[in-house]
Amino acid sequence: MKKYKVIYADPPWAYKVWSRKGAGRSAESHYPTMSIEAIKALPVGELADRDCALFLWITFPMLREAWCVMDAWGFTFKTVAFVWIKQCPKSDNLFTGMGYWTRANAEICLLATRGRPKREARDVKQVILSHVERHSQKPEEARRRIEVLMGDVPRIELFARTSPPGWDVWGNEVASDIQLAERS
């Protein structure tokens, strides 16, 4: 099996919906979601090179669960790689999303490692100010920054929606380059 030095993942987290009004805007109304146990059961660690960086998108209500996922996949948390401050699709105003207590307008991408992956650049910025596109689609700028930060190494995007040049992909919205089945 091919091993990767960069794994970029945006799991389809399942959220508790507290009202009928929120149900229409929830992740479940846009794409199939996965339970935390199902996400943890994916054999992502088997894809990882001895020295590998994991970039894991999460929303703030999933912080605790993200640590469980990183542990299950064999990675150790290092830092927040990116903070995406969302702008409205057609203006530079800040986007107002859903939220359990406050209205969310940011997502974070955690950086975790296995071994000692090599950082190629020291000037990659953390904050990404970018417009929202379709539900849960992450800004292309994040992928570009990962490429600069980590260099031209074997890399894969899990739960991918597109097939960018230089990346292997896996997901239900793309022609996957690998097979990835749950561990038994």
Model-derived regions: residue spans:
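Class I S-adenosyl-L-methionine-dependent methyltransferase catalytic core
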Residues: 1-184
